[in-house]
Amino acid sequence: PANPQKHYETTAVEILNDFPVLDAFVAGIGTAGTLVGVGRKLKEERPETKVIGVEPIKSAVVSGGQPGKHVIQGIGAGFVPGNYDGNVVDEIIQVTDEDALAYGLKASKENGLFIGISSGTAIAAAYKVAKKLGKGKIVVTLAPDGGEKYLSVEAFLTK
């Protein structure tokens, strides 16, 4: 499909050009286009790079769990997306709603990045991966959404 192919041809190439050393790539499992497209290219060019998917702990369907209600838009839709390819993914990490909100808001407050809850999820997972890999390791993630679409979400506004 076109979605993973475009990420294979563009996003992955940009990441490879910008990071001569890359220990892990982390992306949310929404359509799985970014995760699989980038992951496939990374596995071809740098097979030692870990490719890690992220899903909400309350709807960890790709990991074999049950669908459930959560606040993270864009991922954890309650089904395994057609683009998903488990052969490309080394690990799946689950993130709580609370961590998704906290990391999104932290990026906004401390770094001036008005990102959304899905981006907070990616950052929370990347932080977990970086902590696990240890000092000096390079972990890349993408911020897939902005904060403006969450201005009507009470949990986002009350933190």
Tell me the role of every PLM-derived stretch.
Residues 28-39, 118-126, 150:
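Short glycine/serine/threonine-rich phosphate/pyrophosphate-binding segments
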Residues 1-2, 30-33, 55-60, 66-67, ...:
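Glycine-rich beta-alpha junction loops
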Residues 17, 40, 44, 127-131:
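Short, well-ordered alpha-helices that flank and scaffold nucleotide-derived cofactor binding pockets
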Residues 24, 48, 137-138:
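Residues that mark the start of a beta-strand
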Residues 44-117, 154-159:
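Active-site/ligand-binding loops adjacent to catalytic centers
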Residues 1-32, 86, 98-113:
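Active-site/ligand-binding-proximal alpha/beta "capping" segment
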Residues 124-159:
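Phosphate-binding loop/pocket of nucleotide- and phosphate-handling active sites
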Residues 7, 11, 35-45:
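Short Gly/Thr/Asp-enriched flexible loops that form oxyanion-binding sites at enzyme active sites
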